[in-house]
From Swiss-Prot:
Ni(2+) 1 binds at residues 134, 136, 217, 360. CDD domains: Urease_alpha (cd00375). It is found in: Cytoplasm. Heterotrimer of UreA (gamma), UreB (beta) and UreC (alpha) subunits. Three heterotrimers associate to form the active enzyme. PANTHER family: UREASE. GO terms for cellular component: cytoplasm. Keywords: Cytoplasm, Hydrolase, Metal-binding, Nickel. It catalyses: urea + 2 H2O + H(+) = hydrogencarbonate + 2 NH4(+). The gene is ureC1. It comes from Escherichia coli O157:H7. This is Urease subunit alpha. Binds 2 nickel ions per subunit.
Amino acid sequence: MSNISRQAYADMFGPTTGDKIRLADTELWIEVEDDLTTYGEEVKFGGGKVIRDGMGQGQMLSAGCADLVLTNALIIDYWGIVKADIGVKDGRIFAIGKAGNPDIQPNVTIPIGVSTEIIAAEGRIVTAGGVDTHIHWICPQQAEEALTSGITTMIGGGTGPTAGSNATTCTPGPWYIYQMLQAADSLPVNIGLLGKGNCSNPDALREQVAAGVIGLKIHEDWGATPAVINCALTVADEMDVQVALHSDTLNESGFVEDTLTAIGGRTIHTFHTEGAGGGHAPDIITACAHPNILPSSTNPTLPYTVNTIDEHLDMLMVCHHLDPDIAEDVAFAESRIRQETIAAEDVLHDLGAFSLTSSDSQAMGRVGEVVLRTWQVAHRMKVQRGPLPEESGDNDNVRVKRYIAKYTINPALTHGIAHEVGSIEVGKLADLVLWSPAFFGVKPATIVKGGMIAMAPMGDINGSIPTPQPVHYRPMFAALGSARHRCRVTFLSQAAAANGVAEQLNLHSTTAVVKGCRTVQKADMRHNSLLPDITVDSQTYEVRINGELITSEPADILPMAQRYFLF
């Protein structure tokens, strides 16, 4: 076999085992751990290339070959950083390995035939579509904005720009649940709705779950009392759905200890666990120490910068229907914004004590920045804290796996949808995001939804080639017509599926049920399962783990920022 230089190989087929790649303009470097393609037998499409009839393409019928192959992809997922071909069949991942013609090539696990389409992933990073679990359904255009950032699944509640939806992620009652399920049937992303969990009558919660929501949201603006928390968790345990909690900032109905007592060791997803987004002041952050608490952040406080504190007061006043002329409203808002706990939040993510990131879309958070801000935090922590002690070798692979899990597999596990989405694994929906390494986390090169391209940057439609300016993101065929129904999923509760809600509402999209919501624990959070001994000083708000002060310096400059948005 002839040899070529490592540089020439990377230029032709993408990086291979041992090669290092910088992520965007951050200080994060990954190293390829394994290469599942076979040296000398790589497949590539194009003039004079391998994927031609009788060469890398076989003669089998469609039943015996992939519908789509992503060739020579560099996969970043919680389970590894690996070079491989990815095979897709019927909208799902059916193999990760070596593509080609099994009649003449060795080690082929993904047959290529005349029915196979090719996406050239040489020199591209491929990640699973992101899962955002904190969506305020204020406007439907959020779906396209999220999709262009690499988010393919959106979980939350709302009914449009109402006072309730501007502040809380709740779709209240069967009538609104039905309307929102029908409205979402045409969105180009997977969705799951959260009902309003603020009720101490279990029947009022059961009917919402039976109508189709996949979880119940408890929000302080509707009253997050111990009775409400206990009732929602009781119904959730009965019907296998998740409960999401925005707890009582004002400590009116109890303190964080009372909320934990009401939770009673049952699984619960705590939203914006730092507290600037809401929750017991000043110590809701201590909830991350408990094995049944699945703690997440929303992106307004990520990463901590010199502008974070100043930005929050006005955002909070608008989103939570507060009046700047009422002193009590201003005091409420100010009680949630604490520099000390915000400064600790990034570190808790880096330690793996906080397990998820999400947006809080149009309700203090930015729906198109979950991916970007997650990686900005990872960069800041690398710069401030150095390599993680778990790292082996001159790379950031452990840190990268920790951070990618925060918006892919961990939210999917938390909300009972990991059997369908959240990672690049066989059997799951082919929701895949391709990135040029230089634009990683900022601007995807291609977004594949259910095995078909749903969104991509596209140039002048009257151009002679696809690339002339102006180039901007445009919906592709997976987002149009009846194809979008086959390429997306609406998640329902098991009760709603049993009741035939999809048929009653004449939903056209594929549906899937959530499961395992009540058994998932912090220990199941991939790379993010630390249970710290954490305290907050009630006077100074200083956060300590095992007595050691946990803080970080605010950033005055960030990667993945202005230089990427000049065009």
